[in-house]
């Protein structure tokens, strides 16, 4: 039995608009999640006892409902896997990237006006980073990613989003 995915809240002095990210496998099982502190974002009235981290997790995984499944049509997917904003009605937009193997990368931001080209590059880089993690002989496929190197590189990529 694999260990559950852990998420940590990371604080920083010069915040990126990215407030949460997740890497999810083909069966919608989380492999990595991370929530970031952001001073400009105020929670819309949370449910009783709900933390900011729980609210962001819920937002990310609710967005999976808007991503085409395995039986997707050509019109539902783009050639490069970038789906753009998948939840336009939510207070925080979630941008998605899906690979041909069904791996999903979700990025929740405080801004809808992020440059799509830059965002595509960053999501592709996160995908490449996950592939590098797969090449680690000590990583067991389809289990939560616990590598600090992976987490630190994601933080570096996140800082590029402006």
Ranges and model annotations:
Residues 2-20, 26-162:
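Acidic, low-complexity cytosolic segments
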């Amino acid at each position: 039995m694999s260990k559950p995915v852990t998420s940590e809240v990371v604080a920083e002095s010069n915040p990126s608009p990215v407030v949460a990210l997740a890497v999810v496998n083909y069966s919608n099982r989380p492999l990595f999640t991370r929530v970031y502190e952001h001073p400009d974002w105020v929670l819309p009235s949370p449910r009783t006892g709900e933390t900011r981290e729980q609210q962001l997790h819920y937002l990310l995984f609710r967005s999976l409902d808007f991503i085409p499944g395995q039986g997707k049509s050509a019109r539902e997917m783009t050639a490069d896997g970038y789906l753009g904003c998948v939840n336009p009605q939510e207070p925080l937009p979630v941008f998605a990237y899906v690979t041909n193997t069904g791996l999903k990368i979700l990025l929740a931001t405080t801004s809808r006006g992020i440059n799509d080209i830059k965002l595509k590059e960053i999501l592709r880089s996160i995908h490449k980073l996950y592939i590098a993690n797969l090449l680690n002989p000590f990583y067991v496929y389809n289990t939560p990613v616990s590598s600090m190197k992976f987490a630190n590189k994601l933080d570096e990529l996140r800082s590029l989003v402006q």
